[in-house]
Each structure stands twice: as C-alpha cells, then as structure tokens.
Amino acid sequence: MAEKKNQLLKITALLYAIIAFLYGLNYLFFPELQIKMSGTEPIHPAWIRWFGGAMIALGYGSFRIFRNPAKQGIFVTTLCLGTLLVGLGLLYDPIFNWDSSFNLLEQVIPAIVMIIISFLFWISLRKSKEILW
C-alpha cells in the first residue's frame, strides 16, 4: 500500500530530476546558447553558468528521492516551494514587464511546467506523509 502512495512522488521526482539535469547541463556548459535563445541583450556567460551547477545538484537530490523517498520530507517540501517560486518568477516579466523582445516560449512554458511540478510535489507530500516524515 505504501508503494502505491508514493508512486506519484517517485514519478514527480524523476520528472523534475530529468528537467533539472537537462537545464543544468545546458546552463553549465552552454550558457551562450541560453543567452542567444532568450533574445535579450548579451551578458557574460559566468552570470548564468553558476545556475547550471545548482540545477544539477537539485536534480541529483530529486533522483535520490526517486530511489529512496524515506525521510525526505524536508527536501520534497523545499522542491515544492522552489519550483513554485521559479514558476512564478518566470511569469513575472511577461505579466508585469512585457517587452516585445521577450522569447515568450522560453519563459512561459518552463513557468507552467514548474508550477505543475510544484503542484505534483504538493500532492505527493500529502499522499506520502508516513513515508516522508
């Protein structure tokens, strides 16, 4: 029964791990590509390269949850809150600081994905309480 309760948690953790690894590797090793795709003014790649390392670390933690979710409630809570804040942060500029130079797909689609993942982590927290805490 406990395995059924944490199935959503495992799927969500694996999905987030894959997304975090892909974005992390891209930001860490190819920041110039991200800058070019954003359509904004060029910046020094080091300004966003650090973000790649942080994303890889979060992806690794999420993969660890996928493998063994026992007693990982605090990390799942952190991922739930973090993905929500990232999603809302990505939506801020298109809503409040609209500029025709924005690459809307690069901001809105990841924002929606992060908000959905946050919601899935939140549901997983509720369903898997006895496993996570």
Regions found by a protein language model. Give the residues of each.
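Membrane-helix boundary connector in multi-pass membrane proteins
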Residues: 66, 70, 88-106
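Core segments of alpha-helical transmembrane spans in multipass integral membrane proteins
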Residues: 18, 22-23, 45-66, 80-88
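Hydrophobic alpha-helical membrane segments
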Residues: 51, 75-92, 112-117
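Interfacial segments of alpha-helical transmembrane regions
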Residues: 5-17, 74-79
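Membrane-water interface at the C-terminal end of transmembrane alpha helices
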Residues: 113-133
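Structural signal for membrane-spanning alpha-helices in multi-pass inner-membrane proteins
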Residues: 27, 61-66, 90-94, 118-124
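Membrane-helix boundary elements
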Residues: 6-12, 20-45
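Non-cytosolic membrane-interface motifs at loop->transmembrane helix junctions
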Residues: 36-46, 75, 99-110
